[in-house]
């Protein structure tokens, strides 16, 4: 039991154990470089193959991935960006210091992703990009979204932080739009020792720019410097090749977002486990679906043929009594979360002119209807049994109370 909960939300979204420890131990014992080495290259190649993109470039967090991806959009003052309100703040934070107009697009009431019908009505001649999230691992309606974006030259950024292991008609998020971003935070479907991110894309020019940006903007030629003989100074004589070359041509501010070799090595091991980790999530989700669907006034996320939900988040909906149900579940030791508070109602976006009524579906679902239950591979069979029993009992109690009141 974690804290006061018999069935807690994930502090770790995957299983990390002996295999990961052995990978890190072997790296330490090898004496190999601990940054920007072979493991990073292998992890990126493996990830690109899984997603189906030409490039996968690792960075230190999902937030950094989003920051660098948004830079590729080359937004100018007066440009408009259409974004989902149903997301964690990191998706939109890089826009706060840009002189662009954000237009929030309301969400589909089942998938909680951008509603393509509403999206079309928000497009103007100034629309430069669409920022979407594959909420909880349920993929957005990408065919309809891209049919709107492509003819108009609008770039589509996929925040796929929830969607590793998700399938979309034989393809995968991160390779459906123009650029994709993933997170390997501790709670995500796989982790790289707590933090990490990946950017997936096909464009050569963007890949080159991102690679430079994550490596201190080193984009120039490498030329011999004063450490070449006969100019080797005494204090350099034990430095091998470290000081023998100097980069020229650095033109812009850069950063160091290099994923450590230990993190990349763990990521490789986690990729081997991905299918089984996601399958466990789907099994738990199936148990919950079967239990919840029996009760009137509830809705589950039914998944159509061709869609493979990865269930980073398990979401369901009630017509009435959501807050009573949350309290009933807490009393039975089940942790419940509500993700996410609509971004257009947060102080930073209200200050920019957004407010209540702008996205009525997102508002109604958050305040009255939707909720997230634990659905992660760290749950034991006994915990899953308790979860299903607690959900059923709590729904019965809430329904009985409403019937007596009526």
What are the residue ranges of the model-derived segments?
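Conserved PLP-binding active-site segment in aminotransferase class I/II-type PLP enzymes
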Residues: 1-72, 76, 150, 247-250, ...
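PLP-dependent aminotransferase class I/II
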Residues: 41-45, 53-56, 117, 129-133, ...
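Structural detector of well-ordered beta-strand residues that form the stable sheet scaffold
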Residues: 57, 82, 103, 156-157, ...
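Buried hydrophobic packing segments
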Residues: 65-70, 95, 197, 267
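PLP-dependent aminotransferase-like
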Residues: 71-160, 167
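Conserved residues at the C-terminal ends of beta-strands
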Residues: 84, 133, 183, 187, ...
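Conserved active-site segment immediately N-terminal to the catalytic lysine
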Residues: 158-193, 208, 247-249
């Amino acid at each position: 039991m974690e804290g006061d909960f018999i069935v807690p939300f994930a502090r770790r979204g995957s299983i990390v154990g002996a295999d990961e420890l052995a990978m890190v131990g072997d790296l330490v014992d090898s004496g190999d470089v601990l940054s920007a080495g072979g493991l990073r290259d292998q992890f990126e190649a493996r990830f690109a193959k899984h997603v189906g993109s030409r490039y996968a470039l690792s960075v230190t967090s999902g937030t950094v991935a989003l920051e660098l991806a948004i830079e590729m959009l080359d937004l100018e003052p007066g440009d408009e960006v259409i974004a989902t309100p149903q997301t964690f703040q990191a998706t939109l934070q890089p826009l706060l210091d840009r002189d662009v107009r954000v237009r929030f697009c309301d969400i589909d009431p089942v998938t909680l992703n951008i509603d393509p019908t509403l999206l079309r009505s928000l497009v103007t001649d100034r629309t430069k990009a669409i920022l979407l999230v594959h909420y909880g691992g349920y993929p957005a309606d990408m065919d309809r979204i891209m049919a709107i974006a492509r003819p108009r030259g609008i770039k589509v950024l996929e925040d796929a932080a929830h969607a590793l292991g998700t399938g979309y008609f034989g393809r995968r998020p991160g390779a459906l739009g123009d650029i994709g971003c993933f997170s390997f935070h501790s709670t995500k479907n796989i982790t790289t020792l707590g933090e990490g991110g990946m950017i997936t894309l096909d464009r050569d020019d963007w890949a080159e720019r991102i690679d430079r940006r994550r490596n201190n903007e080193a984009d120039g030629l490498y030329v011999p410097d004063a450490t070449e003989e006969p100019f080797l100074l005494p204090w350099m004589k034990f430095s091998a090749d470290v000081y023998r070359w100097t980069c020229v041509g650095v033109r812009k501010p850069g950063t160091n977002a290099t994923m450590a070799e230990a993190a990349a090595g763990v990521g490789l091991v986690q990729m081997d486990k991905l299918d089984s980790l996601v399958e466990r999530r789907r099994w738990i989700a199936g148990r919950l679906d079967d239990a919840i669907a029996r009760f009137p006034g509830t809705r589950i996320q039914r998944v159509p043929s061709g869609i493979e939900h990865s269930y980073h988040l398990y979401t369901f909906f009630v017509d009435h009594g959501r807050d009573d149900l949350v309290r009933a579940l807490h009393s039975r030791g089940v942790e419940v979360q509500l993700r996410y508070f609509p971004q257009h109602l947060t102080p930073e976006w209200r200050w920019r002119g957004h407010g209540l009524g702008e996205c009525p579906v997102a508002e109604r679902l958050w305040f009255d209807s939707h909720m997230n239950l634990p659905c992660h591979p760290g749950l034991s069979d006994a915990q899953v049994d308790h979860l299903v029993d607690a959900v059923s009992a709590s729904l019965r109690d809430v329904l009985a109370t409403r019937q007596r009141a009526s």
